[in-house]
Amino acid sequence: DVSELMQNSKAHLGLMFANMNIPDYADLCFVGSVPFYAVAHPKHALAKLPAITVAQLISHRQILLKGLNGRQLEQFSPMSAQVWWANDFYLIADLVLQDMGWAYLPCHMVEKDIKNGLLCKLPLTLDHKPWSAPVDRIMRKNQPMGPALTWLAHEIKMRFEQRG
Protein backbone atom coordinates (compact mmCIF):
# COMPACT_ATOMS: atom_id res chain seq x y z
CA ASP A 1 0.00 0.00 0.00
CA VAL A 2 2.75 2.46 0.97
CA SER A 3 4.77 1.60 -2.11
CA GLU A 4 1.78 2.37 -4.35
CA LEU A 5 1.21 5.71 -2.60
CA MET A 6 4.84 6.58 -3.26
CA GLN A 7 4.65 5.47 -6.88
CA ASN A 8 1.55 7.62 -7.44
CA SER A 9 3.20 10.62 -5.72
CA LYS A 10 0.53 10.63 -3.00
CA ALA A 11 3.14 10.41 -0.23
CA HIS A 12 6.66 11.76 0.25
CA LEU A 13 7.76 9.32 2.94
CA GLY A 14 6.49 6.04 4.31
CA LEU A 15 7.29 3.04 6.43
CA MET A 16 6.72 -0.47 5.17
CA PHE A 17 7.68 -4.02 5.95
CA ALA A 18 10.80 -4.81 3.95
CA ASN A 19 10.15 -6.35 0.57
CA MET A 20 12.69 -7.95 -1.73
CA ASN A 21 11.05 -6.34 -4.78
CA ILE A 22 12.61 -2.88 -4.68
CA PRO A 23 10.77 -0.48 -6.97
CA ASP A 24 13.04 1.53 -9.29
CA TYR A 25 11.51 4.83 -8.11
CA ALA A 26 12.21 4.08 -4.43
CA ASP A 27 14.96 5.16 -2.10
CA LEU A 28 14.86 2.62 0.74
CA CYS A 29 16.55 2.73 4.11
CA PHE A 30 16.36 -0.16 6.58
CA VAL A 31 15.42 1.47 9.89
CA GLY A 32 14.89 -1.52 12.16
CA SER A 33 12.54 -4.32 13.01
CA VAL A 34 9.21 -4.71 14.73
CA PRO A 35 9.03 -7.71 17.08
CA PHE A 36 5.82 -9.76 17.17
CA TYR A 37 4.20 -12.13 19.66
CA ALA A 38 1.76 -14.88 18.77
CA VAL A 39 -1.26 -14.14 20.99
CA ALA A 40 -4.73 -15.41 21.77
CA HIS A 41 -7.49 -14.75 24.27
CA PRO A 42 -6.76 -16.50 27.61
CA LYS A 43 -9.86 -18.73 27.13
CA HIS A 44 -8.74 -19.82 23.65
CA ALA A 45 -7.88 -23.53 23.35
CA LEU A 46 -4.29 -22.72 22.27
CA ALA A 47 -3.72 -20.63 25.41
CA LYS A 48 -4.12 -23.74 27.54
CA LEU A 49 -1.29 -25.68 25.85
CA PRO A 50 2.23 -25.72 27.40
CA ALA A 51 3.93 -25.78 23.96
CA ILE A 52 2.37 -25.34 20.53
CA THR A 53 3.66 -26.88 17.31
CA VAL A 54 2.85 -25.67 13.80
CA ALA A 55 0.70 -28.78 13.32
CA GLN A 56 -1.44 -27.76 16.30
CA LEU A 57 -2.07 -24.31 14.78
CA ILE A 58 -3.68 -25.71 11.63
CA SER A 59 -7.12 -26.29 13.15
CA HIS A 60 -7.35 -22.90 14.89
CA ARG A 61 -8.48 -19.72 13.11
CA GLN A 62 -5.61 -17.35 12.40
CA ILE A 63 -6.21 -13.64 11.84
CA LEU A 64 -3.76 -12.17 9.35
CA LEU A 65 -2.86 -8.81 7.86
CA LYS A 66 -3.53 -7.95 4.23
CA GLY A 67 -2.89 -4.67 2.46
CA LEU A 68 -5.70 -2.24 1.60
CA ASN A 69 -5.33 -3.45 -1.97
CA GLY A 70 -6.30 -6.96 -0.84
CA ARG A 71 -2.87 -8.45 -1.42
CA GLN A 72 -1.31 -10.76 1.11
CA LEU A 73 1.95 -9.47 2.58
CA GLU A 74 4.88 -11.86 2.17
CA GLN A 75 5.87 -11.47 5.83
CA PHE A 76 2.50 -12.75 7.04
CA SER A 77 1.92 -16.27 5.75
CA PRO A 78 -0.98 -18.43 6.89
CA MET A 79 -0.14 -21.23 9.32
CA SER A 80 -3.75 -22.26 9.77
CA ALA A 81 -6.26 -23.85 7.42
CA GLN A 82 -8.83 -21.29 8.55
CA VAL A 83 -7.84 -17.63 8.07
CA TRP A 84 -9.63 -14.34 8.56
CA TRP A 85 -8.04 -11.26 7.01
CA ALA A 86 -7.91 -7.65 8.18
CA ASN A 87 -6.00 -4.61 6.93
CA ASP A 88 -5.19 -3.12 10.33
CA PHE A 89 -3.32 -4.47 13.36
CA TYR A 90 -5.78 -2.69 15.69
CA LEU A 91 -8.70 -4.55 14.11
CA ILE A 92 -6.78 -7.82 14.41
CA ALA A 93 -6.11 -7.09 18.09
CA ASP A 94 -9.82 -6.38 18.67
CA LEU A 95 -10.78 -9.70 17.06
CA VAL A 96 -8.24 -11.61 19.17
CA LEU A 97 -9.48 -9.83 22.32
CA GLN A 98 -12.97 -11.13 21.43
CA ASP A 99 -11.60 -14.71 21.19
CA MET A 100 -12.18 -14.92 17.43
CA GLY A 101 -8.78 -16.50 16.72
CA TRP A 102 -5.06 -16.15 17.26
CA ALA A 103 -2.61 -13.78 15.56
CA TYR A 104 0.88 -12.39 15.44
CA LEU A 105 0.74 -8.79 16.69
CA PRO A 106 3.46 -6.18 17.33
CA CYS A 107 4.82 -6.62 20.86
CA HIS A 108 4.42 -2.93 21.70
CA MET A 109 0.68 -3.19 20.94
CA VAL A 110 -0.04 -6.22 23.13
CA GLU A 111 2.39 -6.12 26.05
CA LYS A 112 -0.06 -4.21 28.27
CA ASP A 113 -2.93 -6.58 27.44
CA ILE A 114 -0.69 -9.59 28.16
CA LYS A 115 0.37 -8.07 31.49
CA ASN A 116 -3.28 -7.35 32.39
CA GLY A 117 -4.38 -10.89 31.50
CA LEU A 118 -6.51 -9.84 28.52
CA LEU A 119 -4.27 -11.70 26.06
CA CYS A 120 -2.02 -14.71 26.37
CA LYS A 121 1.36 -15.03 24.67
CA LEU A 122 1.34 -18.37 22.87
CA PRO A 123 4.34 -20.66 23.50
CA LEU A 124 5.03 -21.60 19.87
CA THR A 125 7.85 -24.11 19.51
CA LEU A 126 9.06 -22.33 16.37
CA ASP A 127 9.55 -19.00 18.19
CA HIS A 128 12.61 -19.19 20.44
CA LYS A 129 12.59 -15.36 20.42
CA PRO A 130 9.89 -12.93 19.31
CA TRP A 131 9.61 -13.01 15.53
CA SER A 132 10.69 -9.68 14.01
CA ALA A 133 9.71 -8.11 10.71
CA PRO A 134 12.24 -5.75 9.08
CA VAL A 135 11.00 -2.22 8.37
CA ASP A 136 12.15 0.10 5.58
CA ARG A 137 11.69 3.83 5.27
CA ILE A 138 10.70 4.55 1.68
CA MET A 139 11.03 7.83 -0.21
CA ARG A 140 11.01 8.72 -3.88
CA LYS A 141 14.44 8.90 -5.49
CA ASN A 142 15.64 12.41 -6.29
CA GLN A 143 12.69 14.11 -4.60
CA PRO A 144 13.47 17.56 -3.24
CA MET A 145 13.55 17.56 0.56
CA GLY A 146 12.63 20.62 2.54
CA PRO A 147 13.53 21.05 6.20
CA ALA A 148 10.40 19.27 7.51
CA LEU A 149 10.87 16.16 5.36
CA THR A 150 14.60 16.09 6.12
CA TRP A 151 13.85 16.26 9.85
CA LEU A 152 11.14 13.57 9.65
CA ALA A 153 13.30 11.17 7.60
CA HIS A 154 16.10 11.49 10.17
CA GLU A 155 13.76 11.31 13.18
CA ILE A 156 12.22 8.04 11.99
CA LYS A 157 15.66 6.44 11.86
CA MET A 158 16.48 7.72 15.34
CA ARG A 159 13.19 6.44 16.83
CA PHE A 160 13.83 2.93 15.56
CA GLU A 161 17.42 3.14 16.79
CA GLN A 162 16.23 4.09 20.29
CA ARG A 163 13.90 1.08 20.37
CA GLY A 164 16.86 -1.22 19.89
Residue ranges and their predicted role:
Residues 21, 25-100, 105-130, 150, ...:
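C-terminal regulatory
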Residues 14, 82, 141-142:
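Glycine-centered flexibility motif
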Residues 1-23:
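Central regulatory/effector-binding core of bacterial HTH transcription factors
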Residues 39-45, 134-145:
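A bilobed periplasmic-binding-protein/Venus flytrap-type ligand-binding module shared by bacterial periplasmic
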